[in-house]
Amino acid sequence: MSNTLPVTEFLLSKYYELSNTPATDSSSLFKWLYHKTLSRKQLLISDLSSQKKHAISYDQWNDIASRLDDLTGLSEWKTIDESSLYNYKLLQDLTIRMRHLRTTHDYHRLLYLIRTKWVRNLGNMNNVNLYRHSHTGTKQIIHDYLEESQAVLTALIHQSNMNDHYLLGILQQTRRNIGRTALVLSGGSTFGLFHIGVLAALFESDLMPKVISGSSAGAIVASIFCVHTTQEIPSLLTNVLNMEFNIFNDDNSKSPNENLLIKISRFCQNGTWFNNQPLINTMLSFLGNLTFREAYNKTGKILNITVSPASIYEQPKLLNNLTAPNVLIWSAVCASCSLPGVFPSTPLFEKDPHTGKIKEWGATNLHLSNMKFMDGSVDNDMPISRLSEMFNVDHIIACQVNIHVFPLLKFSNTCVGGEIEKEITARFRNQVTKIFKFFSDETIHFLDILKELEFHPYLMTKLKHLFLQQYSGNVTILPDLSMVGQFHEVLKNPSQLFLLHQTTLGARATWPKISMIQNNCGQEFALDKAITFLKEKIIISSSIKNPLQFYQPRFSEQIKSLSIMDADLPGVDLEESSSNSLSIIKSPNKTAAPGRFPLQPLPSPSSTFNKRKMDMLSPSPSPSTSPQRSKSSFTQQGTRQKANSLSFAIGASSLRLKKSPLKVPSRPQFKKRSSYYNQNMSAEMRKNRKKSGTISSYDVQTNSEDFPIPAIENGSFDNTLFNPSRFPMDAMSAATNDNFMNNSDIFQN
């Protein structure tokens, strides 16, 4: 089988090849007699249902499901918009309005409609009950609304002549209003290999969220996936057969009885059934010494791993590139897999970003030193609330394979969707959900009583967390109940056939949910693509046509080379005062042009502002005339006035512009300083800026009065300071003695 096939098709074909299982049901006498009693239509439906169960790709599965909908008359249900399950009139009205504005090229009204009307669950269109009446898809009006949304975004970014910064700002705010989607993978020991099939199906359908979280076995799969780029994922999935998940240590040279005695002895001595050294070695071979920050910088995926503290007084932690940027991923995975009684609890390790030295996380902190962690599924199998707080996540795709959870969720009415369900089955699910809720509340109350009586309070607290957690999401992917029969494989190293079998089950369980995920996340993913396109367009156009303008004419910054110079300034040097290595760029020494003067120092604002203003009327002192003065002497001077230089930050590098030791004419006197630079006259500053005329393309706001929205995603930022046309020429020279550029947030974004 060639690995040029789609990933899921290759894996499922390989599974049938190794298991000697036919891709279709074999004929039998009973089946032949049963088919004789069916009509031609019923026989065709039966054959298609059998083919659907044994499909080896989503395209094949979806095609068969669509044919079944046509044969059974369910396609007609999709074309009827009227339903009490959602607000179909709202969707109809908004679709018509967007189509009208798009065809009439009224892009400003269209953008206003997007900003004010787009939400994720508009008119309850994400109701799971809308996906129980057909084999695939749902109401046609929902598909029409999402297709029109994509057409609208395409027209805005390709056909409208709007300012790119302005359009980008509106779309970014709309995306924040809609929220993010996160994929959450549960624990489940070797049943966690089920997640591989889920990832393969979502990746092929281009529905992979950026935020991925994993606990225990889910942390293993999520971490391996998140340390590989999008281009590396296909080869990673097709080579899954070559992966050796040597998690549970067994000495193959000894008999099973001898291995059992060793495990019993270890459990009596240490309280654990297995040694975690094979787990550590396996994770090191898969992940290396990558940290959360390094993985995010490499792939752009936000990996989250949950760990539970071994102490009763600590809260569960969600590790990611924000909360634990320097923590080694393999140590977080091993800690998240440390199920009590199975693996010993382990500490976390981090890598020093400067020296690369590996040490225990929090070793310099007395509170965290010698702190150990265990299985993340114990306290927080699905960290939904923390993901919402940190990454604006409001839509969860959950994959649940915990052996004590998914059989109960199969009977829950919150995990339906993607499969046809009769009314009697729905009522049965509802009753089961109520009964489970009753027993769960009673169990929690009983555990609280035992804890108050101080009967093993640590154990009672952990057991209580098992019942208080949320194990499902907006879309929940569950394995078939037949997987319970493989319980004996839970604490064994997976064989190649078992791995392929779990992958096959995961892919097939995901296919019925694809249409739900497409509709729930359609606008979000379309906005992500549009925002990415606009950012690339802005970067390319800015680097070619519109370099960043500073407050002096013809003074520009070349971002790539960090070359900052003014051709009319005599002898400007670029010097780096940080650890990064940058080349020193010198402009040709020229004689100062008439009326032009070298860059002057910018003193910090103080109470002696008026005194400095009067001092400017006197000739400024000439710089040092010693040509042998080394560059290091400039970096060692304490104040900006003494150094006679301008320092500012670009990213992580601190750059310094210094004057060359050339004799230059003194500053001419001027009569009146512009009121714009008086820090105590903010009202007049706004008045002067309003009267200044047109706004350049570098401004965050545009001339449109409908959307005065900043174009910066992580906070507003007035970029008009970079436009020299906003200031008169007499104010240009005055700006050099003011704290005009001494704003820490100017280069922050």
Swiss-Prot record:
Motif GXSXG per UniProt: ranges: 214-218
Residues glycosylated per entry: 270, 289, 297, 304, 321, 474, 589, 680, 714, 742
PROSITE patterns, per the entry: PNPLA
EC category name: hydrolase
Documented activity regulation: Loses its lipolytic activity in cells lacking nonpolar lipids, but retains its side activity as lysophospholipid acyltransferase.
Top-level taxonomic group: Eukaryota
GO CC terms, sorted: lipid droplet
Keywords attached to this entry: Glycoprotein, Hydrolase, Lipid degradation, Lipid droplet, Lipid metabolism, Phosphoprotein, Sporulation
Tagged with keyword DNA-binding: no
Region (Disordered): 585-643
Functional note: Lipid particle-localized triacylglycerol (TAG) lipase. The lipid droplet/particle is a lipid storage compartment which serves as a depot of energy and building blocks for membrane lipid biosynthesis. Involved in the mobilization of the non-polar storage lipids triacylglycerols (TAGs) from lipid particles by hydrolysis of TAGs, releasing and supplying specific fatty acids to the appropriate metabolic pathways. Also catalyzes the acylation of lysophosphatidic acid (LPA).
PANTHER family recorded: NEUROPATHY TARGET ESTERASE/SWISS CHEESE D.MELANOGASTER, TRIACYLGLYCEROL LIPASE 4-RELATED
Additional information: Present with 358 molecules/cell in log phase SD medium.
Name of the protein this chain belongs to: Triacylglycerol lipase 5
Species for this entry: Saccharomyces cerevisiae (strain ATCC 204508 / S288c)
Gene encoding the protein: TGL5
